[in-house]
Regions:
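Domain-scale recognition of functional cores that engage charged ligands
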Residues: 1-173
């Protein structure tokens, strides 16, 4: 497909809303929360606006910026972007939770009665946002969180794996 990844994901969410409506349940509310980096925030918002939010109601697409952290050398020294200005980079996927809180999105979700969220990386076009079977399974097990993953293709593949670290489930790189 030559569609932008955001369009693919919005279309998948739209199909879920349609399926819920056809099933006769309550009106489905599936906002699309898009975490950006401070460096890409404006371009991402502009991209959605340029494409009329890919047909999704504008009020159902929420943008929030992840945090940043200082750039360090391997020796732990701060890297400067320019004289007197510390270089920084986005704080990664783990930054989603503090960013949801800081942005006000978490409070907004709570005020709307949202009880569950599905976090996924935007660079995965195979992702099934709010996958009803997966979400339903997690809810049926009263799970605080769930994680879908696949086996590594080879032992040498450089991807994180699910493992216990310090007795807790973790993604180990």
């Amino acid at each position: 497909s030559h569609k932008p990844i955001f369009q693919i994901l919005v279309e998948k969410l739209g199909r879920l809303v349609t399926l819920a409506k056809e099933a006769g349940g309550p009106k489905a509310f599936l906002p699309f929360l898009v975490m950006t980096s401070p460096m890409t925030h404006k371009q991402t918002v502009d991209f959605f606006e340029k494409h009329s939010f890919f047909g999704m109601p504008k009020d159902d697409v929420w943008f929030f910026a992840q945090g940043v952290m200082p750039c360090l050398t391997p020796e732990g020294k701060i890297i400067l972007e320019s004289a007197g200005v510390m270089a920084s980079n986005p704080d990664g996927n783990g930054g989603v939770y503090p960013a949801l809180k800081k942005s006000g999105c978490l409070d907004r979700l709570r005020s709307l009665g949202v009880k569950s969220v599905h976090c996924f990386s935007v660079d995965n076009p195979l992702c099934r946002p709010a996958d009803p079977r997966f979400v339903g399974y997690c809810l049926s097990k009263n799970a605080d969180c769930g994680n879908k993953c696949v086996w590594k293709a080879t032992p040498q593949e450089k991807v994180g794996v699910m493992a216990r670290k310090g007795g807790k489930p973790s993604v180990v790189e």
